[in-house]
Design a protein with these regions (language model features):
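Short amphipathic, positively biased membrane-proximal segments
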Residues: 1-156
């Protein structure tokens, strides 16, 4: 059982840690954190894309691009977490490629819906049964996180 004084000290330290994190975010100092989140998001998103594109049998060779870019973004995010230089060079390059591929994927998914029987005239059905129109924007958001991390300052 902790004494009252020990409880106050523990609570004070955890509050200080949270306050410091909030202060870093308020002042735009969360480059390392956002780099790590970009790395995690890139891996999770790449795995999800792999499973979805695998169920479509990778019918278009372009389906492999976001699967390959996921680990590249993750490696750049981890490098950006440990190195300021990598956060300012490798991370924005990888993130820009991910954003471009996400926008391209949105166009390809829209084209896939248009090619279904009835096309956009039967949009409700084709959006449910065809390629998910907004799913590529998820990978675009992960790339955007990496671009944002590159312009922020490192935590104190």
């Amino acid at each position: 059982m902790m004494t009252r004084r020990a409880q106050r000290n523990t609570a004070g330290r955890s509050t200080f840690g949270i306050d410091r994190m909030v202060r870093n975010v308020e002042t735009g100092r969360f480059e390392r954190s956002l780099s790590a989140l970009t790395a995690a998001g890139a891996l999770v998103t790449a795995a999800e894309i792999f499973f979805e594109h695998d169920s479509a049998s990778f019918g278009n060779k372009m389906m492999w691009v976001p699967v390959v870019l996921g680990p590249v973004g993750a490696a750049a995010g981890v490098a950006g977490f440990f190195s300021r230089r990598m956060a300012k060079t490798a991370l924005p390059v990888a993130s820009a490629a991910i954003v471009a591929n996400g926008l391209q994927g949105t166009c390809l998914h829209a084209r896939g819906i248009a090619q279904k029987p009835g096309g956009w005239k039967n949009a409700r059905y084709n959006m449910e049964m065809g390629p998910p129109l907004l799913a590529p924007l998820l990978v675009t958001m992960v790339g955007g996180m990496g671009l944002l991390a590159a312009v922020l300052r490192r935590e104190k």
